[in-house]
Amino acid sequence: MGNTLDSNKPKNFVTYADYKYIGKLNNKNEHHGIGIILYNSGESFYGSFINGKKEGKGIYIDKNLTRYINTWVDNKVFGKVKVVPYNSNRVYYFYYKNYMIEKCIYFDNNINNKESHHKNNIYNNYDNNSYNNNSCDDEEKRKYPIGVTKFKEDLSNYIHSTHIMKKNNKLFNKNDNEYNIFSSSLSYSSDSENINLLDILKKKKNKKNKKNKKKKNKKTKNTQILSCTQHKMYEHNMNESNFTKKDNVNCEHTDKMNISLHEKNDKKNEKKNEKKNKKKKLFKYFSNNIENLIIENYQTWSLREVIQWLMLCNVPVKWLISFYKNNITGDKLKYININTIRNELGIIAYGHAIKILQLIKNLQVMAYNKKFNNLIQIEEYKNYIRQKENTNKNIKKGKNIKKEKKKKKEKNIKKEKKKKKKETKKFNNMDKKYIDLAIHKNVKNIQNDTFYNKHENIYNCKNQTNFIYQNDSEIKKIMNKKKVSFEYDNNEEKKKKNIIKFIKNNKSLQNSNGEYYLINHLSKGICSDSIFYKSSQSKSSSQLSSPLSSPLSSPSPSSSPSSSPSSSPSSSPSSSPSPSSSPSPSSSPSSSPSSSPSSPPSPLSYKDNFPISSSCSSLERLPSYEKKLLSSSQSNIEHIKNLPLDVLSNNNSSANIKIKKSKSKYNNDKKEQKKLPLILNKSSSEFSPSHSYTSKSYHYNIKPSLQSSSNNSSDSSYSISSTCSSSSSYVSSLYSNRSNDILNFYRNKIIKYCNNIYMNTKLAYSYMNGFIIPHEDLIFIHPIENYYMDNTNEKNNINNPYTKEKIMNHNFSFNTKNNTSFIDINTNIFSSNKQQNINNFGKYKKMKSRMFKGKYMGKEVAIKILVGKIKNFKKLHQILYNLYNLRHSNLVLIMGVSIHYPFVFIIYEYMKNKCLFSYLHCIKYKHVYISTFLQRYKTLLHITQQEKIKKTNNINNNNNINHNNINNNNINHNNINHNNINNNNINNNNINYNKDYNNKKKKEDEQHNIEHQDTFIDLPEKSNISSDDNNSTDISQIQKENFHFLNKKIEENKNIIYDDHTSTLSDHSIHNINKSYDNVYKNKMNIFHYQHNVLCGAYDNNDNNINDNDIYCNNIYDNNINDNHIYCNNINDNHIYCNNINDNHIYCNNIYDHHKNTSLNSKEQNTDHNIEQINECNKYASETKYNIKKSNLKNNIISHKNFQKCNQIQMNQPYTFPPYQKELSSYLKNEKIKRKRKVLFSYLKTHIHFNSQQINDQHNRLSVQKIMKIITDVTLACTYLEKEKMSPINLKPTNILLDESLNAKISDFGISKIENCLDMNIDYSYKISSNSVIKINKKEYEQKKAKKIKIVNKNNNDLLYLYDHNNNVYKYNTQYIDVTYNNSYPSIFYWTPPEILRGKKNKKFYSDIYAFGIILWEMLSNDIPYNYPFASHIMAVVGYANEELSFNNIPVSIQSLIKACVNRNKYKRPTFEHILKTISTLYQKANTKVEDALISFMDGT
């Protein structure tokens, strides 16, 4: 038989309208003999026929891979029917008479998994007896006596031992020459000679007995020799050994020799034990001396201490040597980067370099946490937070009182305006000398007076003060703009009182809008910054200075009163503990204590012209936090206890922290001035980045400039993916060449969540914590998907030279190169015409995968997703440790593992050529990423033409109303009842959907939808598009090239109706996009981006759950549950239904319902007739449930069987096969059986990618040398894993990855062991029914302030919208992942061996060797073997029938190896060691031929 159905057709191959037949025929071309029927709907049948009718035993395989085994008589079912589901160990038996079912029996035992072995070969005359072994019942198996079963077990054990042991193996001899000759005759043929296994077992037992006798003889000899004395020796007869008399001298000689031998052996053993004890002592010494290594002061470590730390981390010896040679101490650990590790230390592997950096990261996190714990006590800080909450309440009460006062003040201000006008005239005529004298008399330490213009920034150096020279004309313009203030010194209060008296006498200094106060802060002859403050009241200074103390923090001697500067408009309010600091070179702080809060400041009027962009303070931020903590002394801990973390980050070398609290009275006009800053003084003259927070939006601006943030509402820029976990707050820049990266932004997390401080000293020494990666550091870009073609028609074959010049179009049809080459992959692969799918079996197929392309620390990474809850952490850590120890050049490097319930992410290195399957067969495509700038560009484009669209919409709406009224009569109300939902709101939505659907149907052929411009655009071919290597494109190029293209497209589609819900450019409306876009980036502690960037959901296959009342409670969901955009993209035909009827691989929402009634042939019938049948099925199922519930009360339990009786159930259609699916479905619903469930994995929408598919010339066949190179790499890796006992390897063509130079590497080994540690019964955060109705767990999402979740099905991919209470939208990309409950039942594909297809298990390497043979055939023939569209066809053809591979274009020397690997008897398959020997000989032969050819070419012969 051939590889495909059409390329290599056998002789007896007949195609019909509904199925295809492969087998024997009569003279009348009727089915006669053994044959296979492959139905176009996905089912298959294997059995015997007589004159076109089914007779004898047969196996019917469903779409769900459930096997129905029974006997047929005249094309009718006779006797009992055995039902074997694929993913469960339960077996059902249906007994019936006269077309009436009498009873049903099921077995829960694992009898079918036990393999039966016979004396003769099972596969001799398989055509006649292929189904006897599989169709035997459990009752018949139990008839065998106990001795027969033991004999079979002995046979299986012997066969397994012969497969492993080379000495006893007669199939594979020692010599290679004998192996090649002998194996071709025996092991490479499926029909081998019979072996007398009884004789072999007898020989084996005799050998064992002989070995045991020899051992006993040796023991007796040793005892006799040692027991001999100087006296005469006597003869002893023990085990046929004769001892004669000997002399005393000989006896003494033998005694000495034996004693000396024992002494030598004892000494050797003692030395070995001493070495072991020394190693144990050293390990105990280092483990006990963990306390000697002070983690806090790791920067002061010597070389010895660094090596001691690495030894405790269980690092390889090569790393220790490289650290020792380069003399790396604790100071150098901070400056280590990837380049230094690879170039200087000599550790070239990128993965190993990252793991070293992860160890250093853990050490620094532990050091920071210890230092932080010493400085701050958490209990006292909780009291601080409580006080802060009380102040917030008091402030709210104070605001209401202020409003009443404002109204009274406004009346008084109008009366005083006349008086103030007179005072302003006097103030304008005042000279500058009064102010200059007032300053110069009272400030002694000013050495240089610097004057600046109004457009320059103000900055201070040591022993200098800065103030602005101003003219009288300039003062008039600036009086109402700024507040400025000076700090004042406590030691010079007397001199300031004189200034206050001088100002009180001169009333002309008063301004119309308020008073100016001047405060000078002097300390040890050094003047600090000058900050000007303007008060809001016209009262005297004594009244203003009284309410200075604010309840922000507990009173401390370091607190000094001051006024709030107006120069920093982004200053934080009093409720926030974070300071608003603006960068400027600062002067050295004062060591003298500040004044008491009761002492009032001295007011002094002053004039200033202060630019908006300028700001000055005495703050500067050090690049790292660790230097500050080391310099701080223990005496300052009492001052620091009650301060927030951001205040501590600005700590001084002298550790004298001074807080300036703002006054409690504010200006009436400006709301920005209501925010109180917390300002610190520091001693350094370097520039520092601005660090300003607000209550609504936390700004984090990293700019080495002197400008402060302009507005409170300005957009804050920060990275979405965090680079530190919740336990770590500060990590230096290990992974970049920069050394001054500032990450103090995340320190606030530890303070807000005080209990999350992870104080475990083992963190610094544990390597596994470096291997386990936080999920926040992972970025998911897109799933790795492979699409390939069915070679059913030679016209559509990729390898055909006629199709090489053609390119795929949007509808998967071939066109010339002039057309576009972009394809929307995630749409339905199959065309809307069902007849084409029936004839072609579906042109394109998709490989299911759980792999994603992502990024980790800026490096491209492949991420595999596993679903489940971890049962045993100890086993999982052991498995991960064993995987880490596996080191081979042909194994894919595992970067790490991250755990985020309910997912387990395994991170691999990314290979650019992807897997071998995609390199050979799949369609080549590129990914283009477009940034958010292009989104805004499209919104602006949309807004400009929105007016034109509205005009066309108004015209179209009038025309569509009449058209919809006509179509309403043709709508069947059964479509609504089909969803099992009785709410009136939902019914109305379904009717409206049918109206819109009929309107849009006519326009699909003429025009394209603009609804999905955001996710997919058909760009012209001339545009320069970056490949998968470059993850970003130049937006300017795309903008220039595609601007004209987009305008044309919008003009063509003017007549399309735009809805707020369906358009991708707007979630609610275009006006609200900018608000939702900005709000995503404003929130600092964003739960959706940081803590929950990965969500989880599960599809519930039961339709009964849709009618639950919990779905609609508390108005969590919209009334419009079935929006128009939910179904508009998935429905292409009237034959498709929302409840996921298995209809030619077209499913709504990609949900696979295992227990639906598949006996309905919806293809051949109309929609009305199908709906009637579905309603009948539901009624019938409800009746059977009632009967079964009655019968459950009368269960009869028999000794060793689970026996269940039922009432007689009448069969509606006795002659159509299978007639018992309704009855089986009723049992399955009552019994909780393990079954597949789909999980909706959702990740953040970081990029918009377009899938551009182009067929390249890489589909040509690989050369023989490249094939041999790939095969040798695979065999080397498999032999290494076989020695390490990592079974099963899970070898597949999709798990073989290729480099740029086509070096093969194996992945996914050991994942089956990890899955055994997982529990698939998960408490999902939300569930999705078949109607895409979402059910949320309230407790979890109410805490997160999530309002609702909605799925929007798009052409490109399904998006999940998550709404806040503020109606902010967060978009998530989604992917459907199958959750398998039993790992022993793998997915079926063309590489699965026949024993697994028949329902058995393989715990050894047998299945991997079978897959190896198919991979070799696949590479040599450049074709897919057993390329059938359905898994049931593969199960029937490969599992039960004897379809063989064709070896037309494959060399003869390799054919024998492939036949051995693909042998149906798994015990006759070779091991990987034997495969290596054969490949080495073949590789040498191939090289000799090439060398001979070269020599002959050079010689000219």
Curated annotation (Swiss-Prot):
Keywords: ATP-binding, Coiled coil, Glycoprotein, Host cell membrane, Host cytoplasm, Host cytoskeleton, Host membrane, Membrane, Nucleotide-binding
Domain SAM: start-end pairs: 301-366
Glycosylation sites: 64, 128, 133, 239, 242, 258, 327, 448, 463, 471, 506, 652, 681, 712, 737, 811, 819, 1024, 1031, 1074, 1157, 1382
Basic and acidic residues composition bias: residue spans: 257-273, 666-675
InterPro entries (alphabetical): Kinase-like_dom_sf, Prot_kinase_dom, SAM, SAM/pointed_sf, Ser-Thr/Tyr_kinase_cat_dom, Ser/Thr_Kinases-Pseudokinases
Motif annotated as RVxF motif 2, chain positions: 1238-1241
Protein name: Inactive protein tyrosine kinase pTKL
Species in which this protein is naturally found: Plasmodium falciparum (isolate 3D7)
UniProt lineage: Eukaryota, Sar, Alveolata, Apicomplexa, Aconoidasida
